[in-house]
């Protein structure tokens, strides 16, 4: 599929080569710089052969003359002893084994990708698995998923049903993954793969990226490096529970499996039914971790992310400014304030609704999406009129999947909530929150109607902040049959996706943020329907350096809502100077999470200047290529990254000091991604120093900057009474 490149990369062959049968029918699934080769010989076992740097036709021919057969391309349970499996089932007659052979394959050219579909059939049962690969024509991403079809007389039970499997040749292989918790999301962890099984999984039920992320990277040449070395990245594109397994047994290969977490999710596949797993996206690069990140960022912006080609507005969100203390005059003042600083959008957060139960705190009224006329006498219409007057767009907060026991919705429809039979409800936020059962089509209709009614009445609304503040903690569906209770986790997310599809079909231009108690929905399963996600409820700038660093492994800056917040910070109570808070926020989708009236004139002027400067670099940050330079996790006292424009004519360099000691020594940081032949003029943005930096306005070759970097002062050159233990820099590089 696709054209073969002419170069042969022997290290890559050594990386993942598995010899093929001499009579094999090898098929190459290729992207611009990578190849995945499988053996789909009709009547034989489906075999994996190779994944790595792109192969030429001659290399493919060499593989075909190989020798012994390779690893299974999709291992199944039953006849291979203790080996791990991607698929295990129980047939209608109780047989728990599978023996699959290739029945055939098809290749289809889509607009921007090639698709290979290899159909497998059990030797004794009319049970089918189609293993699918989509290779993109212009970005180094290959998606893999499976379609499982039951042609048997009765239902077949699926007990393990992974989307993808990839064997990785043993060696000095390291795995990078993200873990965390509420307000501490996307923390980076790196481990060498050793004998045993390493599992990354999430069982939250509604969200899936607080305690772990469904994405991993494998560094094949030892401990991960940012811009050198061979790396494989994998991301499951799913909004629900998942499990990623890296199994190291007594074979020569690490075995990587990715799929829906089977925990309490046994699935009864009816006669004639096809179960389609979520896709897992793979990328390979020999340009290190950042190389894989750039591949995922380009793929995401081009093919997955809603409005991935559209610049994001600079906004003010009301939450940390007023919390539940919503009132008409206060909202109008915040609109005026963000407009005066150059902002483009105002978002009214929680606290604006409720009739019988007033949303003055977090323990009531979810589901009762009517305006609290005491707080907002002129309703949403009045706020929209004020936004138009101020010249800003207007957005609003919703939590459509949730309710409270103290709500009119719950009083009317207690049968709509996720609830275990014969058990008392386990309640969430505020001691009253419950989750609506999206497995129920009536609930799907209701959740859709929340957005539909809002947008029908107020079509001028530009932005919705969609929140989700509870996990599934009452495992039980009042809609599903007793025999299908194990389907709840899966059916919830099928229902969720159906709702999102309906919303996007009717409101394709609406901007929607995925907020889920902060960063609970940072995944490629929801982003086809959402424009961005809230990285974390923790807006502390220092902690955001760490969280946004980890998040950037798989998600571009355009997806990361990054806001300037208060000092002391409302989560850590750390006092960080405004410049540092701005410089961190400018590395993502810039916004504000603050009450502007607490800012003095000097601070407002600094925000106004920073917003104006961000507008000039917005295309570079939101659409540029990331190069991570110095990790905060290495504890060198500094973190640094940069974004480079597609034509390498502009770049933005970020430098944040992460700790301060007297007479400390910080590393000088070489840049990356520049054109070595071009000369770049340096301009500092968000400058507060009394005098310009020594290199301000000067030009350096890209080669010099990538070999040497620049000597960054350890502190800001400001008056004595303004000095503190923080320092940060944002530099604009423009080719002459």
Sequence positions of predicted segments:
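Glycine-rich, aromatic-flanked loop segments that form ligand/cofactor-binding clefts
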Residues: 78-100, 226-240, 283-305, 343-350, ...
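Conserved, mostly hydrophobic/aromatic
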Residues: 33, 146, 272, 387, ...
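Aromatic-lined carbohydrate-binding/catalytic grooves of carbohydrate-active enzymes
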Residues: 307-449, 458, 463
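C-terminal beta-sandwich/jelly-roll accessory domains of carbohydrate-active enzymes
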Residues: 659-736
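Short Pro-Gly-centered flexible turn/kink motifs
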Residues: 33, 98-100, 267-286, 726-734
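Active-site neighborhood of glycoside hydrolase catalytic domains
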Residues: 377-379, 411-413, 417-579, 589, ...
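Polysaccharide-binding surfaces and accessory modules of carbohydrate-active proteins
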Residues: 25-38, 45-247, 263, 679-695
